[in-house]
Design a protein with these regions (language model features):
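A detector of repeated loop/turn-to-beta-strand junctions in beta-rich toroidal repeat architectures
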Residues: 15, 55, 115-118, 159, ...
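Short, conserved, GDST-rich strand-edge loop motifs in beta-rich repeat architectures
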Residues: 95-116, 254
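Beta-propeller domains
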Residues: 4-32
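Short loop/turn segments immediately following the C-termini of beta-strands
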Residues: 13, 53, 98-99, 157, ...
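A short loop-to-beta-strand structural motif that recurs across blades of beta-propeller domains
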Residues: 17-19, 57-59, 119-122, 161-163, ...
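Short loop/turn segments immediately following beta-strands, especially the blade-tip
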Residues: 164-172, 254-261
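A short beta-strand motif characteristic of beta-propeller blades
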Residues: 25-31, 68-75, 129-135, 175-183, ...
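Beta-rich, blade/repeat-based domains predominating
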Residues: 1-8, 33-52, 57, 75-93, ...
Length: 262
């Protein structure tokens, strides 16, 4: 992502590090250890909000640089391993919670014990309540809102599909339906996902980035060498699309800008 001050941030999950790249400076460690940080985004106050895989929490970087846990349990039980994350304009934080992080090297003892019998989508309300939002998922991963936030998109790595949900005024969702099923035999799975300002959905998948319109029709693919893991728009005009793979970061310019995160 391209936050203020022209920095690009990305996570190295196995390396347990959040990195930053700044023009004229280059690559630097931002946070280490990072609780094997996975997905991250910014809230409307410009604070970095992070899905902590090994910490099994959602945490935030305050303006003074301190790290604060904002969600850690649902009904008294630890989350599995928060995967990806998005913030709604009212301040609600939504994230996917799958069990992949329970096998990260270096996790020991109680941290390996799964306490929830579901892999789901949760949200933290502006009032600080954790709400179960989508529970009929197999392995939820990427998620994003449509530009007007009327639809929440959630993909499922195991099933290889993207679902769409209507968002109610209170932040709950309804009317879940399959938007698109990813196809292909090349490297890549349903993982990171974002929307552009015209409502098209960009999702990692076999061979790179699959682009669908709001009706689920495939309108194009962006070929990426290697296994694409996540993506984010950045730069001042939000027309630069950054894509991570297991070992590299790629950048391309797009005709349609992405949805800003602040």
């Amino acid at each position: 992502m391209g936050p203020p001050n022209s920095r690009f941030l990305w996570t190295d999950i196995i390396g347990d590090t959040i990195w930053q790249w700044t023009p004229g400076v280059g690559k630097q460690v931002l946070i280490h250890p990072s609780s094997h940080a996975n997905g991250m985004t910014f809230d409307r106050d410009g604070r970095l909000v992070v899905a902590g895989w090994s910490a099994r929490t959602i945490w935030r970087v305050e303006k003074d640089g301190s790290l604060v846990t904002i969600a850690s349990r649902y009904q008294g039980k630890k989350f599995n391993s928060p995967n990806d994350i998005v913030v709604r304009s009212d301040g609600s934080v939504y994230w996917t919670d799958s069990a992949g992080g329970l096998v990260i090297p270096g996790m020991v003892g109680e941290d390996l014990q799964r306490q929830l019998d579901i892999q789901a989508v949760f949200r933290l309300t502006p009032q600080g309540e954790v709400k179960l939002t989508v529970e009929d998922t197999v392995y939820p991963n990427g998620l994003c809102f449509s530009p007007d936030e009327s639809i929440l998109y959630v993909n499922d790595t195991r099933l290889g599909l993207i679902r769409a949900f209507d968002v109610n005024a209170d932040g709950s969702v309804c009317n879940g339906r399959v938007l698109h099923t990813l196809t292909g035999t090349e490297a890549g799975v349903a993982d990171g996902m974002k929307c552009d300002q015209e409502g098209n959905v960009y999702c990692t998948g076999p061979g790179g980035i699959h682009v669908m319109d709001a009706n689920g029709a495939l309108i194009g693919r962006l070929r990426i060498p290697g296994h694409a893991t996540n993506l984010a728009w950045g730069d001042d005009d939000w027309r630069s699309l950054y894509v991570t793979t297991y070992h590299f970061v790629f950048r391309t310019r797009t005709k349609i800008p992405g949805v800003p995160v602040w």
